[in-house]
Amino acid sequence: MKIIDKLTEEVLNNKYYNDLYKKCSLLSADINLKIKSSKYNLTSKELNDSLRFADILSNSTNSVARNNSYQIVTYLNSHYSENEIYKTVATAVYSKLGNFPAINYLNTYNNNDAILPINREIEVEAKKLIQKVPDTENIFFTDSQFELYSKLINTLEYSFSGPTSMGKSFIIKAFIKKVMKNNPPENLVILVPTRALINQFTIDLKEEIRQLSKVYKYRILTNSNISDFSENELHNYILILTPERLISYLSQESNPPIGFIFVDEAHKLTNEKDSRSVTTYTAIEKTIKKYGNIKLYFASPNVSNPEIFLKLFNRNNVNSSFQTNESPVSQNLFFIDLLNNKIELIQGKNNTTIESDALFKKVNNTTDLIQHLGKGKNNLIYCNSKSRTIEEANNFSKTVVNSKMSTELKKAIKQIENYIHPQYYLANLLKNRVAYHYGKLPQLVRNLVEDLYKNEDIQNVFCTSTLLEGVNMPTQNIFILNNKNGLKKLQSIDFWNLSGRAGRLSRELFGNIFCIQHDNCTWDNKDILNKSEISLTPTVLTKIDRNIRKIEKLLKNQEISGTQEEKYILKYIANIISVDTLELQSNYRSPVIDKLIEKNKNEIIELAKQKVKDYSIPSYILNSNQSITLSTQNDVYLELKKNNKKGENIKLPNSSKIDYCVCLEVLEYMYKIYNWKNGEKKLQNIGSLKYYALLMNQWVNGLSLSQIIKQSLDYHENNMIDIQVDYNDFVPFKRGNQKHINIVIEDIIENIEYVLRFLFEKYFNHHYQIVASIVGEDSAGENWASLLEYGTQNRIAIALQNIGLSRHTALGIYENCKQSLTIENGKLKKVNKEMILARFKVGSLEFDEINRIL
């Protein structure tokens, strides 16, 4: 054992050290809770000893010791930042940890100009030289970031995990820049769980690689339609895709090969209660099958066994995973019980009750608490559902007085009123520097909220589990108002992923997490607060292990018990097993088939073979559409093939003929042929098709969101339509009621995002694939799935969206700036950014987005 390791062990087990560590943490807690007390002030000896312990621990390789070292110095910062000994030791500790953002904080906010001994200075300069981020000026990796980056660039497959605040996206972007310089160049896919993340990652990456992409001829795309561009010179691609879009990319034989796939938020593969975890598995498995030697990488937060993701896909090389608990920012976790007037500082097994009578004299409810503890700070407030998020934001906003608005904030309010509606809640909330944020919020509005928050133009953002999807909104404080995600209990992986947003690198040394027990949320079990190792198992493996009998029943076409979502996931997995048996003839065994063979479940494999052996539908269509019932797919194929033989037209109408009547006719046709009455819960009511046809017609014909909303509000008013204001409460719509207006707006946004752009798109894409397989792609007509995805029939507007622009801006460019676009053979070849910007008003939504994306 090295001397430093022995010394570290002695320190961590030393009672005096542990007493000091606790006192330092309570001193910091009093400040964060605004409890004015001198109870935990340190004597001179205690201060010096605490700093000496921190200095010793910073030399360790033990991540617990290094974290403790960081935390001691951070705990003491608010009280002792002007103390000369503190200044020197703080600089020395952060330097030893390679935490350059923390050193920058000391210089910027503490005016810390401490000079280290010459040997320490040399060590710091050497570390800077080695850990400088490529293609940047004065930006350096922390020690743990550099260790990971060094391993990443020297492997062909890797899986890594660390705290949310570690800066995994930062490392991924540095890795991408390195890959772009490879010779020969290769195409990359960044796989993200949601469309919201596509936009965020695209914006961040474009800012990072703007110059490199010109030099190395890389183009960033956000969808699978590469053919929408006219190419005179060869380009390479960085594709930022959801699992669904990757599956679509794989189904297009003309698309170029992929050399790298980087799976961000890989823990989503283990979410047993979300069918998209199975879609993610399918997308990755199909990619590996198609491009056998593809380089494969996984990134996940707070997972103790990151190697599990490589093992899932039979990639199990030694030394191909990395896990660390070392974080460049610290988090203070408090449990505040408003029912019993109690506060606990949570520190693993050493939780401490904090005397807090003075606090509870000022605070009676969650709003009081957020205003008191969050005053003058950036606060994210987590709620468990969209409706609760909007409700809490509105209630909180009513208590805010005399909120001064910045120029940027005033501009954003005007933009949202024009883009959505003047009575939209969010526009009113922003006047009090309050906002809400959820996954299906329109892309442009999400961007506005995130930018306003990042730049501190707004202070309090109420949000849903969108933060759990990886949306990058670091904050000073997080208030957790509910311990559920929807109706389900928050899982440990989700809780710590959410909590990890507290603390903004370079802006502060720590963040605060306040878990609140109140009238609407009781924490019967607080185990989730005590951080422990989080070991995960992918959904497909878990379901096969625990539900093999149910899967067997499904393969026999028998009914099974369980919730709708559970049954859907098991049907999905049964489909995957069945389709995968078709590959056995070519000696390819998928991970799922391998798992069944390993468990001696050959009878399941045989059942699956029997299920599909007489199917006529081409296997590549089944492969691309495993979430649609296999028998339905085959029935549709046989029906269309029979109709084609009779000489009937099996194509959908040409896009130039689309109106309300055509949309309704097509939806009724799809309802019948795909058996939505029995196979798709959301679409089983045939009466709802009239509404969806109306919305679909407006959407694919390019109406703006504000126009769609206005027409819908007119329709509701003129026809006295009943709207749902509560769980079982329906009332006639009233135009003068702001709540009614917002219910209609939220319904429209939800139906565009989920029904049109997800459900309908899935079925229309499947229909197009079948038609193309029967009559050939050149004769297959329009793929309505593209019209639904992009909300336009215009190929140029589609191409503009594919490079990262929103539908709104893409349509605006096409309508107002055609002369700025070089179009060749009906395809987009080149965009003149300067000419386009000249046509839009400075400060408009469109101007800001064009400036950022193009």
Task: Tell where the protein language model's regions lie, with residue ranges.
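N-terminal helicase ATP-binding lobe
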Residues: 1-854
